[in-house]
Amino acid sequence: MVLFCPKTRRGNQPHLTSIPHRIDSISLQRYNTLNYIATAIYRKQTKGEYPMIVYHGSSHIVQKPVYNGSKRSNDYGYGFYTTESIELAKEWACSDGQNGFANKYEADLRSLNVLNLNSPEYNILNWLALLTRYRSYWQKNSIAEDAKTYLQENFLIDVDPFDVIIGYRADDSYFSFAQDFVAGTISLAKLSEAMRLGKLGEQIVFKSKRSFSHISFIDAEPADASIYYERKATRDREARQEYRRSKKATDSINELFIIDTMRENIKNGDPRLQ
């Protein structure tokens, strides 16, 4: 199987990329999976040598992103939220059932301070601690309240020194998975598995004022709500169905729940979190 990584705006031409044979055997159930795999391999090969192409889904064309123009209650607080997948951007653009646009940008991160939450030095609880800080509508039971406090005291990363954050996107269904872990109803292993459902991939969030000068608008492509609103709804529905099936599976006695994390005073660096 061969995928082509498209030419960048500055003319840097990646070569044809052969996908390893092991990926051929994976059941690719989502329409944008191949695009996501190709992007991941391309980024690994280029190692940041080339500027990135990112997309922002919105109801209108955004030629000049506005610093702190988003909601503070987004996953990582104020920021300009983008993805490397034009298909996902179109879904986000039509999330209210109306037509929108996938705005295309060139982004150069080489001189920026980037926090990649999916890199080996971090774990899913670092991501979750940030989510508990910025997202609202968490359960109010005692375990959930204690869990939020524990996560923020032991796993919260100071994002102020960073210009850009790369990490999971907590769409509605994915946020509910995170809520279940914080409430103590699913294990850490099941949360990690759930975050891979639906192939949402990563989002790239421009946080600092300096980072906004590293984004250049290229163009915008219309997103038809009759197509992409349904795709987003289907993705969410299938992820929830898959999650419910996974949730019914018997937990191993060795699996970690949030209450175990608190009782055993587990912190960053514990091998059980990897």
Feature map (PLM): residue ranges:
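Intrinsically disordered, low-complexity segments enriched in serine/proline and basic residues
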Residues: 10, 14-15, 37, 41
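Short hydrophobic targeting helices and cationic amphipathic motifs
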Residues: 13-16, 22-28
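ADP-ribose/NAD+-binding catalytic cleft of ART/PARP-like enzymes
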Residues: 24-75, 103, 263, 268
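Conserved NAD+-utilizing ADP-ribose enzyme module
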Residues: 38, 96-100, 109-274
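Short, flexible loop/turn elements at secondary-structure junctions
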Residues: 59, 86, 109-111
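Extended catalytic/binding region for NAD+/ADP-ribose chemistry, centered on the ART fold
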Residues: 71-96
